[in-house]
């Protein structure tokens, strides 16, 4: 017997929530039970998150991240004012289109804090991709790394000087 990862249908927050839930081998009922949802359709609230009919609150998002053992940044709705949102968007895009490449001409980009964070993160990501391609790490380890990317180190990277950086940092506290 083997397990094949389900396909990511799109990059919406709801689809990412569903994708990770399935990856963790959980049902909607498992999640409803964990959160203590009751009533006739206990998984209705969570289904509305996965179907993009409702957005989880910041507190609920932190709780979901805890249940799924992922960074909140992997499952939050992206606004792209934050460099972390850009990085995670590309990582999720790779789940939809495996092995796509990002090429940078590092000498031609504007030297801003935003771009530096993206450049450093992509460089680290490229190193992990190489490890996966050389079979130094398993695909599962690579995906876990992406789900938890910068979860513990984000506080050190983000200075909190700009509004978008503060938004990212508040999820990590």
Describe the residue ranges of each PLM region.
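Short, Lys/Arg-enriched N-terminal segment that forms or immediately precedes the first helix
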Residues: 1-5
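Charged, helix-prone or intrinsically disordered regulatory segments positioned adjacent to compact structured domains
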Residues: 6-11, 19, 55, 59-62, ...
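Residue-level signal for the short linker/turn that defines the boundary of a DNA-recognition helix
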Residues: 12-15, 25-26, 41, 56-59
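Short basic helix-loop element that most often maps to the first helix and adjoining turn
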Residues: 14-35
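Recognition helix of helix-turn-helix/homeodomain-like DNA-binding domains
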Residues: 36-56, 77-81
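Mature, Sec-exported extracytoplasmic domains of Gram-positive
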Residues: 40, 50, 121-123, 132, ...
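Short, charged, amphipathic alpha-helical segments
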Residues: 139-147
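Short, charge-rich amphipathic alpha-helical segments embedded
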Residues: 150-164
């Amino acid at each position: 017997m083997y397990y094949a990862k389900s396909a990511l249908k799109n990059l919406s927050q709801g689809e990412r929530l569903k994708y990770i839930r399935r990856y963790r081998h959980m049902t909607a009922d498992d999640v409803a039970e964990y959160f203590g949802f009751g009533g006739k359709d206990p998984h209705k609230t969570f289904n509305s998150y996965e179907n993009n009919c409702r957005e989880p609150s910041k507190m609920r998002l932190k709780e979901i991240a805890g249940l799924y053992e992922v960074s909140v940044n992997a499952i939050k709705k992206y606004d792209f004012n934050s460099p972390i949102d850009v990085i995670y968007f590309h990582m999720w895009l790779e789940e939809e289109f495996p092995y796509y490449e990002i090429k940078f001409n590092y000498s031609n980009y504007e030297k801003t804090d935003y771009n530096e964070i993206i450049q450093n993160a992509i460089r680290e990501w490229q190193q992990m991709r190489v490890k996966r391609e050389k079979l130094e790490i398993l695909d599962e380890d690579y995906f876990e790394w992406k789900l938890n990317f910068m979860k513990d180190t984000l506080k050190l990277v983000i200075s909190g000087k700009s509004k978008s950086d503060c938004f990212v940092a508040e999820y990590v506290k």
